[in-house]
């Protein structure tokens, strides 16, 4: 008998169906020589200090080290944090299934986290059977069948597990030590720090404070209007004057002027290629920008579409495709273009066009997000929005470039320089899918029929205007901006960033105000407590992902990595103890 372990019930049932294991039991499926069971996500975690009998922590006890055992996931109940009863019961089912089989197939998420989940489960239950790895990028029947026919040895993923386990231990070391240290320093225990969550919270709070303390600045832009070929064009003074008296004087001079002299005309045509295929971060950003979906919603929706066999594995950082996957796309695209909503693009799609979408070599990393050949059934509104984004991006990738003409005209009026910058689209190409002209506008005004201007041409002034402007404060972060910030700062991965935001929300450090993410009073208190300290600095651990990638490649040992982490932990806890002498406050004070 062969056991198969997945990390979601619906994934387990889908694999069981394909393999003919159709008999439903309590917590698993069986039949045709297979027993297929599942976890409910990650049900095990590194033990906390209290789990090994450490009730009180003194400064001399730092750095705290993780106990050498795992514990069942805890959930908050009326009586405090207790083991999740659903996890406890399912672990018993999994143990029963694994004990009844002589071979185990790991079919958990094909990722670092999925590998760690299985390895922790395998060790926690004391398994000794040989194991194999199912590594697939979609849940179509074809992908499952092909994956089962090409199972991989588990030891091929040893370094992947080491990278995941190293990241897990490093997060424990920094998060637990800094949290215990800050709670001890400020005298109460309802604060939590983390190597990614704290820098993200600090950045959210920093921008919030910047907005609160903002003082608007005045400026007075001056415009002139000129007429040519019965078309009125408005040109702007190249500098927005900040002294009202000077702006008013320029305005009066322009009113008195009879003509404007064209000093320069610049035109250039640019071919703008389609954006690359989606990875999770780019999908989250676009779904937030265009449809106001949060990063958490997008990841959950994308996971649902994956489990419905409609898209490939979503939690990927790649925007490329291996050649073997690329070569399977023509029939998928043809099937998609046969649908009435996409039929109009059938003549412009070029399936041989985007060769730069192909990876130089195949890797075990998941490729860019693409649709599968499975036709969507009934999807809810938000699912359809995300699915349409993915379909649209694939169409864009296989369409010709967008051709745009950019024009800049400079002129002199009243001895001062004015300018107009316009664009017009000559050939839409891929831009025709969603008609989002702002992508190619580059801050210019649209002008589809621009009059022809000539250098040294003299034209009459048709009017002028003076506007009083006040600068606006920076807006609070949106999900799009937060995902972009974390991506550029090297904070977390595409798989973990959503959980960071979820943690900050659950711990009531941040909240949503419309589409914006703002800190709560509790979050602001924690920010003021750690502001300027290493634990709130995004650069403190930004190099970790590079080192974890080296562990994956076998270029760095776990011991070397964790030795460096311990040095960082000592620096962080030492700084907290120096900056915050013990100061007792009532429990729950913020």
Residue ranges and their predicted role:
Residues 1-168, 172-174, 465:
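Intrinsically disordered, low-complexity regulatory segments
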Residues 11, 15, 86-97, 110-121, ...:
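Helical mechanochemical/support elements of P-loop NTPase systems and associated helical scaffolds
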Residues 14, 18, 97-100, 120-124, ...:
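Generic, well-ordered alpha-helical scaffold segments in large soluble proteins
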Residues 23-27, 154-159, 180-184, 209-214, ...:
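Active-site phosphate-binding and catalytic loops of NTP-dependent enzymes
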Residues 35, 43-83, 191-303, 307, ...:
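Long, highly charged, low-complexity internal segments
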Residues 166-179, 224-226, 270-282, 296, ...:
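Core structural elements
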Residues 312-337, 350, 499-535:
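Accessory beta->alpha helical hairpin/"wing" motif in late/C-terminal subdomains of nucleic-acid enzymes
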Residues 339-367, 535-580:
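Leucine-rich, amphipathic alpha-helical/linker segments
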């Amino acid at each position: 008998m062969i056991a198969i372990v997945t990390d979601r019930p619906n994934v387990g049932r889908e694999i069981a169906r394909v393999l003919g294991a159709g008999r439903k039991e309590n917590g698993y499926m069986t039949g045709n020589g297979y027993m297929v069971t599942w976890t409910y996500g990650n049900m095990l975690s590194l033990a906390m200090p209290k789990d090994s009998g450490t009730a009180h922590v003194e400064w001399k006890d730092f750095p705290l080290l993780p106990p050498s055992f795992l514990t069942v996931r805890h959930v908050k109940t009326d009586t405090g944090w207790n083991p999740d009863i659903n996890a406890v019961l399912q672990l018993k089912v999994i143990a029963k299934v694994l004990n009844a089989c002589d071979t185990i197939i790991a079919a958990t998420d094909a990722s670092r986290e999925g590998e760690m989940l299985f390895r922790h489960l395998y060790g926690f239950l004391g398994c000794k059977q040989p194991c194999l790895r199912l590594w697939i990028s979609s849940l179509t029947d074809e992908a499952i069948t092909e994956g089962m026919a090409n199972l991989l040895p588990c030891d091929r993923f040893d370094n992947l597990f080491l990278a995941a386990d190293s990241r897990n231990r490093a997060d424990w070391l920094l998060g637990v030590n800094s949290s215990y240290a800050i709670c001890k320093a400020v005298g109460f225990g309802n604060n939590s720090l983390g190597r990614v969550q704290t820098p993200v919270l600090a950045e959210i709070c920093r921008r919030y404070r910047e907005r609160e303390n903002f003082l608007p600045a005045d400026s007075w832009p001056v415009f002139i209007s000129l007429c040519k070929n019965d078309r009125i064009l408005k040109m702007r003074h190249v500098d927005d004057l900040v002294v009202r008296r000077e702006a008013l004087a320029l305005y009066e001079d322009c009113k008195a002027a009879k003509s404007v002299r064209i000093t320069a005309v610049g035109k250039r045509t640019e071919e703008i290629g389609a954006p690359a295929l989606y990875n999770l971060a780019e999908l989250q950003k676009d779904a937030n920008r265009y449809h106001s979906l949060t990063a958490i919603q997008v990841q959950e929706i994308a996971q649902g579409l994956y489990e419905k066999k409609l898209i490939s594995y979503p939690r990927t950082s790649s925007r490329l495709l291996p050649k073997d996957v690329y070569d399977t796309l023509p029939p998928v695209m043809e099937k998609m273009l046969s649908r009435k909503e996409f039929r109009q693009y059938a003549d412009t799609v070029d399936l041989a066009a985007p060769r730069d979408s192909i990876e130089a070599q195949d890797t075990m990393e998941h490729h860019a997000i693409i649709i599968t050949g499975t036709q969507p059934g009934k999807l809810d509104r938000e699912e359809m929005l995300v699915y349409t984004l993915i379909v649209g991006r694939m169409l864009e990738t296989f369409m010709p470039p967008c051709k745009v003409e950019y024009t800049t005209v400079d002129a002199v009026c009243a001895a001062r320089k004015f300018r107009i910058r316009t664009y017009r689209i000559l050939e839409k190409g891929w831009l025709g899918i969603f008609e989002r002209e702002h992508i190619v506008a580059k801050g210019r005004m649209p002008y589809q029929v621009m009059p022809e201007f000539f250098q040294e041409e003299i034209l009459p002034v048709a009017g002028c205007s003076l506007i009083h402007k006040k600068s606006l404060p920076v807006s609070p972060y949106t999900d799009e901006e937060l995902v972009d910030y974390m991506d550029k700062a090297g904070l977390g991965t595409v798989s973990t960033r959503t959980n960071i935001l979820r943690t900050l929300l659950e711990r009531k450090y941040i909240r949503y105000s419309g589409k914006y993410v703002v800190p709560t009073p509790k979050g602001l208190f924690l920010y003021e407590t750690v502001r300027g300290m290493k634990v709130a600095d995004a650069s403190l651990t930004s190099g970790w992902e590079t080192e974890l990638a080296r562990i994956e490649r076998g270029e760095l040992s776990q011991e070397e990595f964790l030795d460096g982490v311990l040095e960082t932990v000592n620096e962080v806890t030492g700084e907290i103890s120096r900056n915050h002498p013990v100061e007792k406050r009532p429990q729950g004070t913020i």
